[in-house]
């Protein structure tokens, strides 16, 4: 089987900066030397900021992390590139890894909505309003808070600029409100790393209704490899079978064109059994094949669904 991967979420830029590691080779979950078995690799790379920083300090830290990541890309320009659009991606040789930039937690705007234009100009194409708790824009998954007036302004500006909203860390009210705004503007929304709440109950996981709203918007949903999202507290470590359970559940919601992978590599501490890094994801594909998933469906979940979404942006 030929392996291709379009993964919707990793936190590698932050880890590279914080731990002073290289993108080419490291002991993290994502490194260029760990993707040699993939004939194509596309990654949405999120930039997150420490929660012991103020919003303004987090904004400054964002640029440090981004600039470090860009230097890593430049140091490996024969093997990796940052893309801003499908057209830029399509021009890359297949052996060049493509990274798209995301911001995880828009608190870095620090109340200045014009900063979203700076993020767009810097290459950011995906944005989540929260990581946890409440901020000036609205509520995270662990709250019941809705969008604030400022949050609605930011969402509208993001849509107008061409930044896709990621609702993975949003409260139920925020998800509903962003979905409503997206429907009015005929824009898709995504959940880059959110599993099925009906399989494993967790406030970060999606209800059937939330998944359906994302699907109906034309968006996609990535399967997270975080243990708590896969199996809750039912066991100390998740198995590949737990990943497949969430995939199968989403497929049962008519999600064959919606479900993708959003592994959350370098953002999770405990990976599923036998999957230590991106280098091991072929084991998931092989396990799916052993459960009679067609090669076409495996390819769709690993790569094609996300690529088709990218083409529409």
Description of each model-found segment:
Residues 3-7, 42, 98-102, 125-126, ...:
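Structural preference for beta-strand elements that scaffold enzyme active sites
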Residues 9, 35, 85, 123, ...:
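Conserved, mostly hydrophobic/aromatic
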Residues 9-13, 48-50, 85, 102-106, ...:
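Active-site beta-loop-alpha junctions enriched in small/polar residues
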Residues 20-37, 283-285:
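Short catalytic helix/loop segments, enriched in acidic residues and glycine
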Residues 36-113, 136-152, 156-157, 167, ...:
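A metal-dependent hydrolase metal-coordination microenvironment
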Residues 111-121, 125, 142-190, 203-217, ...:
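Histidine/acidic residue-rich metal-binding segments in metalloenzymes
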Residues 225, 254-278:
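Short acidic/histidine-rich active-site segments
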Residues 276-313:
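Mid-to-C-terminal alpha-helical segments outside catalytic/metal-binding sites
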